[in-house]
UniProtKB/Swiss-Prot annotation:
Keywords: Ribonucleoprotein, Ribosomal protein, RNA-binding, rRNA-binding. The gene is rplF. It comes from the Bacteria. The keyword Plastid does not apply. This protein binds to the 23S rRNA, and is important in its secondary structure. It is located near the subunit interface in the base of the L7/L12 stalk, and near the tRNA binding site of the peptidyltransferase center. One of its GO terms (biological process) is cytoplasmic translation. InterPro entries: Ribosomal_uL6-like, Ribosomal_uL6-like_a/b-dom_sf, Ribosomal_uL6_a/b-dom, Ribosomal_uL6_bac-type, Ribosomal_uL6_CS. Part of the 50S ribosomal subunit. The lineage of its organism: Bacteria, Pseudomonadati, Chlamydiota, Chlamydiia, Chlamydiales. This is Large ribosomal subunit protein uL6. Belongs to the universal ribosomal protein uL6 family. GO terms for molecular function: rRNA binding; structural constituent of ribosome. GO terms for cellular component: cytosolic large ribosomal subunit.
Length: 183
């Protein structure tokens, strides 16, 4: 049994959870999310608390799936109540970003502007041309979109130029030593 899944998920004010067929639906002030449940878990809703337990007939892999669905439901509850945000910073001469409609336009030191379509459930804002904020209620979509932006120009280890998460540590390497000595 998963250690985290032993504890119930406490629902904050304004968040409702319901079971429909084989799906769990979480509704809150920021929107609603749906997740299909695996047959290895049983979800019970009692008094503003959600309990995730293994199905009685499953012996194969109950604790892993139980912990997974506990985390998924917990993230859904947090997403519809508070939301998620990932912040990225661009470091480099001439690096800048802009949002044009539903497209994120990046100038990242290549010969052409890089355009990334923004998914419908994600809000992207650009501050000071080099700070990108990705917000949404689905933790997986927010993280995946932020990772796709970062993958366009990862921070390089010599000068640190590139796109990185805010407060991300980039391990630096020493460059080539200057040649000194005999001719």
């Amino acid at each position: 049994m998963s250690r985290k899944a032993r504890d119930p998920i406490v629902l904050p004010q304004g968040v409702e959870v319901s079971l429909q067929n084989n799906e769990i639906v979480v509704k809150g002030p920021k929107g609603s999310l749906t997740q299909t449940l695996a047959p290895e878990v049983v979800v019970e809703i009692k008094d503003k608390e959600v309990f995730v337990s293994p199905a009685p007939n499953v012996v194969d892999r109950p604790s892993r799936v139980q912990g997974l669905f506990w985390a998924l439901i917990s993230n859904m509850v947090q997403g519809v109540s508070a939301g998620f945000e990932k912040r990225l910073e661009m470091i480099g001469v001439g690096f800048r970003a802009a949002v044009q409609g539903s497209v994120l336009d990046l100038s990242i030191g290549v010969s052409h502007p890089t355009k990334i379509p923004i998914p419908a459930d994600i809000q992207v804002t650009v501050e000071k041309n080099t700070l990108i904020s990705v917000k949404g209620i689905n933790k997986q979509l927010v993280g995946e979109f932020a990772a796709n932006i970062r993958a366009k120009r990862r921070p390089e280890p010599y000068k640190g130029k590139g796109i990185r998460y805010e407060n991300e540590y980039v391990r630096r390497k020493a460059g080539k030593a200057a040649k000194t000595g005999k001719k």
